[in-house]
Amino acid sequence: MAYQRVLLKLSGEALMGDQGYGIDPAIVSAIAKDVAEVVAKGTQLAIVVGGGNIFRGLKGSAAGMERATADYVGMLATVMNAITLQDGLERAGVPTRVQSAIAMQEVAEPYIRRKAMRHLEKGRVVIFGAGCGNPFFTTDTTAALRAAEINAHVVLKATKVDGVYDKDPVRFPDAVRYEHLTFQDVLANELGVMDATAIALCKDNTIPIVVFDLFGSGNISRAVAGEPIGTRITSAA
């Protein structure tokens, strides 16, 4: 495998499938199956999951909520997703721990870096919930932060599209997909694949990012193996 320790970023929207809201059990089962295959090959895997399928802080803020309050509600949504994903993984035979940046000891461990790394070394998947515990930071930034903290070799951003495009491929059929970008390309052109804070964190810590389509069968395994898939973002051109 190309990467020994991986941080997988899953959007909350990915978990809802075509439902428009909530969690699609079939999607959770499919993700669990792919993750089980990766872990069985010896890869150490941590996951950061978003909460946009349940609540998105920015939308709440736009609707009149105080931004910090809306972000905290969004963090709680990520914990709901994390626990659901943990259940799916354990039904697939993958030992899993959820660590929350907001204390809720009845359902999750507190986030402790050394403990998370020990879980990974023992072959357990660690799911990080509640973002980084602070408002005004996205779960993409959390993914970059946790990747740096656990010494991950790559951030795999699993999305609904098969990479980064020069414009929205849903709206523009002539959109062109990039196979490779530098961090500076993403920042300078405001490509929007991740927020600038997340990109800067990965850039500063020399952690490559691979953006790929979550829904292609076996794509998580392919991304972990370093196969050419989606768009790769690195320091060098």
UniProtKB/Swiss-Prot annotation:
GO terms, biological process: 'de novo' CTP biosynthetic process; UDP biosynthetic process
Gene: pyrH
Keywords linked to the UniProt accession: Allosteric enzyme, ATP-binding, Cytoplasm, Kinase, Nucleotide-binding, Pyrimidine biosynthesis, Transferase
Species name: Synechococcus sp. (strain RCC307)
Assembly information from the UniProt record: Homohexamer.
Activity regulation behaviour: Allosterically activated by GTP. Inhibited by UTP.
Pfam families named in the record: AA_kinase
Region (Involved in allosteric activation by GTP): 17-22
Name by which UniProt lists this protein: Uridylate kinase
